[in-house]
Amino acid sequence: MASYLRLRILFAMPSSKAVVRYKNEINRASHSLDIAEARIILSAIAQVPRNSEVSDRELYWVSAADVVSLGSGSTSVYQQMKTAAENLFNRYITLQNESSSGRTGKSVLKFRWIQAVQYEEGTGKIGIQFSARILPFISHIQSEFTHYHLCELEGFQNYNTVRLYSMIAQYKSTGKFFTTVAHLRVALELGDKYPAYAELKRR
């Protein structure tokens, strides 16, 4: 029998106008990011125009100040951004759907978040060029999308916390979040961690 998780949702009033917006499929995917990389990716997504087509040649700049404003330590932010610049090119997103071929099982699609990254030594600025595969999920969005103000992520120190908050934000209009524990395990890439449902709830 599947285990389910229900949460009642309360959101604080935002203090910034920068909005993260993407298709709901992103919430159901696994992401392979750490918290520093996530702050950079989400800061870049917040710059993508909502209602217009975007080329994969666009470069979105994220500064050290942007990352610090989301909760990164100011003394280590330059090293965090340099490390993130080295790692982001190899980070990917994995989408699982029912097989479209009529066969039983899942259809798994894996692609990179970005196709290029540029790091400016001494300035702590990173330029992000999103991959062509991710663009349909983060640009020209008209329906079935999740959105929240970037500043709502301030102080989160663990990427799974960001992920869970993002999943909940999808249902902010209803005030209730409902999912299976099995889905959380896949989306948060928990594997065999916290095998007991009660332990997962505590975490």
State each model region's role.
Residues A2-R203:
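Charged, alpha-helix-forming regions
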